[in-house]
UniProtKB/Swiss-Prot annotation:
Xref: Gene3D superfamilies: P-loop containing nucleotide triphosphate hydrolases
Pfam families xrefs: PapZ_C, RapZ-like_N
Source lineage: Bacteria, Bacillati, Actinomycetota, Actinomycetes, Propionibacteriales
Alphabetized UniProt keyword annotations: ATP-binding, GTP-binding, Nucleotide-binding
Keyword Zinc-finger: no
Protein name (database record): Nucleotide-binding protein Noca_2527
Protein species of origin: Nocardioides sp. (strain ATCC BAA-499 / JS614)
Protein task: Displays ATPase and GTPase activities.
Binding site for GTP: 77-80
Segments traversing the membrane: none
Residue positions binding ATP: 26-33
Record bears the keyword Nucleotide-binding: yes
Length: 301
């Protein structure tokens, strides 16, 4: 188990400069892939499962092809084995020519066991033994790296969103930390999405289902979308609702929230909600938010 004193290490990172190098390592199941994905979203060039002996070559290649200002993140795991000595030497000597930050992710053994079992994957060091045996070996192999880490994050009590927030707090800038908005369509007859922050009901709009030529189509088809958006009530709704969402989104960012889910429903989740989801996603994207639209119940009827 990680000690309390180490897991409470400050998460304050020294002032960052262009061309930073972040090295992510830590325990299997502690969230390395999640951290890497967030760093990629923050503009880092990410290399996963890199043998430390190739670190200088990767930095040189990125410098030559993308410029020295391109931040780089590399993920190194226990499968690199004895190469860890090379990594420590490179970081200690500044051999890459970049300011390097070493991030170590860990969690309590019982949490790591649950995560690995849920993923149905063996531990790379467990061999023919138990999963816990692999974790014990891994802690031993990584002990020195953990001691050298600039940032230790204990993910025992963190979910995916909370871990990405921690990474963004450490390595993001106002220009790179953006609110991620998901707009999801659904059918009320299948239930409201449980993770929705906002729910809007489109059943006040005329239903294309009752128009024979539109019935087999969906809200992603231009004919259906045009029909829905041509309704005066649809325009009134958008003009009133989207500014509210923009105001809330700005508040979310001020409060450190980085995810917002907006659910748009109609009877079956095929016509009205789908068209409105696409339009709201488009408008929020034009307002500068990172948006994606998804249609939970499309094709379910």
């Amino acid at each position: 188990m990680p000690s309390n004193s180490a897991s409470e290490r400050s998460t304050t990172i020294p002032d960052r400069t262009p061309g930073e190098l972040v090295v992510v390592t830590g325990m299997t199941g502690a969230g390395r892939s999640t951290a890497a994905k967030e760093l990629e979203d923050l503009g880092y060039y990410v290399v996963d499962n890199l043998p430390p002996s190739l670190l200088r070559d990767v930095v040189r290649l990125v410098d030559e092809t993308r410029g020295t200002a391109q931040p780089i993140a590399v993920v190194v795991d226990v499968r690199s084995g004895s190469f860890f000595q090379t990594l420590q030497a490179n970081l200690a000597q500044g051999a890459t020519g970049r300011h390097a930050t070493l991030v170590f992710l860990e969690a309590d053994d019982d949490v790591l066991v649950r995560r690995q079992e849920a993923a149905r994957r063996p531990h790379p060091l467990q061999g023919g033994g138990r999963l816990i045996d692999g974790l014990v070996r891994e802690r031993g192999v990584l002990a020195d790296l953990r001691g050298d880490a600039d940032l230790v994050i204990d993910t025992t009590g963190l979910n995916v969103h909370q871990l990405t927030d921690r990474i963004a707090d450490a390595f993001g800038t106002p220009d790179t930390v953006r609110l991620k908005v998901t707009v999801i369509s659904f059918g009320f007859k299948y239930g409201i999405p449980v993770d929705a922050d906002f729910v809007a009901d489109m059943r006040f709009l005329p239903n294309p289902h009752w128009i024979p030529e539109l019935r087999p189509r969906t809200g992603r088809d231009a004919a259906v979308a045009d029909y829905v958006m041509a309704q005066p009530a649809a325009a009134e709704f958008l003009d009133a609702y989207v500014p509210v969402l923009e105001g809330v989104a700005s508040g979310y960012l001020r409060e450190g929230k980085r995810f917002m889910t907006i659910a748009i429903g109609c009877t079956g989740g095929k016509h009205r909600s789908v068209a409105m989801t696409e339009e709201i996603s488009r408008r929020l994207g034009e307002a500068g938010y990172e948006t994606r639209s998804t249609h939970r119940d499309l094709g379910r009827e």
